A protein has these predicted regions:
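Rossmann-fold dinucleotide-binding core
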Residues: 121-199
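Structural/interface elements that position substrates and couple domains in central-metabolism enzymes
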Residues: 202-208
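NAD(P)+-binding Rossmann beta1-loop-alpha1 motif at the extreme N-terminus of oxidoreductases
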Residues: 2-65
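Rossmann-like dinucleotide-binding cores of NAD(P)H-dependent redox enzymes
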Residues: 40-73, 163-168, 186, 195-201
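Structural motif
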Residues: 18, 41, 82, 97, ...
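Rossmann-like NAD(P)-binding element
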Residues: 46-50, 61-121, 129
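NAD(P)-dependent Rossmann-like dehydrogenase/reductase catalytic/cofactor-binding core
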Residues: 2-11, 34-36, 181-188, 215, ...
Length: 330
């Protein structure tokens, strides 16, 4: 595989996606839009026609939003859905999207490595398992990385490329270059750490949010309202460090001395979410989460989130990370 920062011909780079549930199928859509031939593999028997319909619907929506211009069938012609690992043989890149279970992933890696070339890159979409730990399950740890996506994969600008202790950095840099063809602003995580970057930031917020509700400081609705109208207002333009620069670093320095010791640092799962899960709650999926949902409300929330993802994508593209550099050049 050519490891250069020149123009990359995505149509010559076959991509395998192993595990084609909601996330895996969304990644398939992203790769098809980027021009890759895609092999979507179901490691356990599934209704492949249902998966194809999901990808087809994603492509239809992408076309309506102007993300793609070719007919949906043009992209589907570059997609193979299968349950046969041997079909992964021509892939230069494989993305594993199976359950967050080390034993399951280890078995999947053995089957993948039995058929792909030695110079093919193998990645995992894990959001919780350290990449270095997963590298212990593969024959060629140097070519193994984390690729942490968010859903919808074909509209979000987010992607983390994570090195394990044994990853070859040059291959990670190549993945970051390739990710730009997927319409990503990739984050390169140089050192392996549990949760990577985005999850560590977000789970600190989730813990504090649960604490504020459990201790009676605010309701679920009010915590959500504060997030939507504060961080939700600026975070697409500026990350946390840029925001502190914009609004005065010295102010945050002054507040940290007194506030940081007062923040919740309990390592146990918050009672608020624990009670919901023990009662069978899954959120919108079954109508029972921090809020309750009728079937129609659940459907409309999912529909609205998808609609919002297209709108926020347009805003993110208008204000990319280098927006000021572009203005200086104009």
């Amino acid at each position: 595989m050519i490891m250069e920062k020149a123009v990359i011909d995505t149509d010559k780079i076959g991509v395998g996606v192993v595990g084609i549930g909601l996330m895996g199928s969304s990644i398939c859509t992203c790769m098809l839009i980027a021009g890759h031939p895609v092999i979507g593999l179901a490691p356990i028997p599934v209704d492949l026609e249902a998966v194809k319909l999901r990808i087809c619907n994603d492509l239809d929506e992408a076309r309506r939003e102007g993300i793609i211009t070719q007919p949906t069938q043009y992209y589907l012609d570059h997609l193979l859905l299968t349950e046969n690992y041997e079909d992964l043989a021509p892939c230069s890149l494989v993305v594993e999207c199976t359950l967050e279970d080390l034993n399951i992933k280890s078995g999947v890696y053995q089957k993948i490595e039995a058929v792909i070339a030695e110079d093919a890159i193998l990645t995992s979409n894990t959001s919780a398992i350290p990449i270095t730990l997963l590298q212990q399950s593969v024959k060629h740890p140097g070519r193994f990385f984390g690729l942490h996506w968010t859903i919808p994969a074909f509209t979000s600008r987010f992607l983390e490329v994570i090195c394990g202790d044994h990853s070859e950095v040059s291959k990670g840099e190549y993945l970051c270059e390739l990710a730009k063809y997927w319409s990503k602003e990739p984050t390169f995580v140089h050192k392996d750490i549990r949760g990577f970057i985005a999850n560590r930031l977000m789970y600190a917020m989730y813990r504090e949010a649960c604490h504020l509700v459990e201790e009676g400081y605010a309701s679920v609705e009010d915590v959500d309202r504060a997030c939507r109208n504060n961080t939700g207002y600026w975070m697409t333009l500026a990350g946390v460090f840029r925001w502190m620069d914009l609004t005065g670093v010295q102010a945050y320095h002054a507040v940290m001395k007194d506030l940081l010791p007062d923040l919740n640092a309990d390592p146990s799962i918050p009672t608020l979410i624990d009670d919901i899960v023990k009662a069978g709650g899954k959120g919108v999926a079954n109508g029972h989460g921090f809020y309750t949902y009728t079937p129609e409300e659940a459907r409309l929330w999912e529909e609205t989130y998808k609609e919002f993802s297209f709108e926020i994508r347009k805003l993110a593209l208008k204000y990319p990370a280098d927006v000021v550099k572009r203005k200086l050049k104009s």
